[in-house]
Amino acid sequence: MENLIIAIDQSTSATKAMLFNERCEMLRRVNVTHEQYYPKSGWVEHDAEEIYRNVQKSIAELIKEEVADNMYSLAITNQRETVVVWNKHTGKPICNAVVWQCMRGADICNELKASGY
């Protein structure tokens, strides 16, 4: 059996996992959506644990036992500047992920810009 490639696209709205062969032909695709949270006006957050579970779920649905031994490569893309702070002792997120669309830092950016930065 030929070598297989997994591609994971963890985007703003979902985790997408794709399985390709060596000729870059897509063999399977899985899409698992996640919630977006808006705790305040202009704020956008994701549950980092949900995203982690969705990545695990998408890979499990994508690969079958018969192809697991033929995995050759893994490619990952993610959501631009989305940030998650993890507890170094527990491995758990301290708070929700701050999504790249979130505007909570806009005032700080505007102040820096006005100061010449």
Q: What positions do the PLM features span?
A:
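N-terminal glycine/serine-rich phosphate-binding loop of ATP-dependent small-molecule kinases
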Residues: 1-95
